[in-house]
A protein has these predicted regions:
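Charged helix-capping and loop-helix junction motifs
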Residues: 1-2, 46, 101-105, 132-141, ...
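His/Asp/Glu-enriched short active-site or ligand-binding loop at hydrolase and phosphoryl-transfer sites
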Residues: 112-126
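Mid-to-C-terminal alpha-helical segments outside catalytic/metal-binding sites
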Residues: 169-205
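Short acidic/histidine-rich active-site segments
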Residues: 148-166
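Divalent metal-coordination and catalytic microenvironments
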Residues: 15, 63, 115, 157, ...
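N-terminal hydrophobic targeting/anchoring segments and the immediately downstream early-domain regions
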Residues: 1-18, 198-204
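Acidic (Asp/Glu)-rich catalytic clusters
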Residues: 5-12, 54, 77-82, 105-112, ...
């Protein structure tokens, strides 16, 4: 994912920090400090992570925080700015154990990060393929989305057995945002223009 050469040019658009193997997730879900860390015991970003950031900065690749904790994500966003990363995405800022306060989100944005909100929070719960998670209201999701639409992207995080198809999930998300007071232009930022900008695609009017 470093310098693009020959037929491999632009194949890498994003590098995520650990997700299912993240230490934070293992602590919260299993009570065990196992997995792949992103910071040391003093809260400093690991040198290996800094090297990944340097690659992202050099090749203009997205650096995404994965399943890091809220405070870890803020630390990563700060370090990414220091290193020169131009596309830092804070993952799942509205979701489950990664859910941030509005003040934390604003701190990340002030550090130059983009915020990702996943609509899966409004689709899981009892009677679904992910029954053990508490469902978020569409109003609460919209409240996250309206914090800074110009610095946010929306994903579905779908693809699991027993859950809606990602396309259907995105359709439901867009309708929910419009029904809860967001303007079409704001929604377009988050589901169209901003994602395209991050992965280096042009958007036709």
């Amino acid at each position: 994912c470093g310098k693009s050469r020959g037929h491999n040019r632009n194949l890498c658009r994003c590098i995520w920090m650990p997700t299912q193997d993240a230490v934070y997730q293992n602590i919260r879900y299993h009570g065990k400090k196992e997995g792949v860390p992103v910071v040391d015991d003093n809260g400093r970003v690991l040198s290996e992570v800094v090297r990944v950031m340097e690659i992202c900065a050099e090749a203009n690749i997205i650096f995404a925080t994965g399943h890091s904790s809220s405070e870890e994500s803020i630390t990563l966003a700060r370090k990414a700015r220091e290193v020169g990363v131009r596309k830092c995405v804070v993952t799942h800022a509205n979701s489950g154990i990664w859910k941030m306060t509005h003040d934390q989100i604003k701190r990340c944005i002030d550090l130059g990060a983009w915020m990702e909100y996943s609509y899966i929070t409004n689709l899981w719960g009892p009677g679904t393929g992910l029954p053990d998670f508490e469902r978020m209201s569409d109003k609460e999701f919209a409240d996250f989305a309206r914090i800074a639409p110009q610095r946010s992207i929306i994903t579905t995080d779908l693809g699991q057995v027993g859950m809606p198809h990602p396309v259907d999930g995105m359709r439901r998300c867009i309708l929910a945002l419009l029904e809860n007071g967001l303007a079409q232009k704001q929604v377009d930022f988050m589901v169209r223009s901003n994602p395209a900008q991050l992965v280096g695609l042009s958007v036709s009017e």
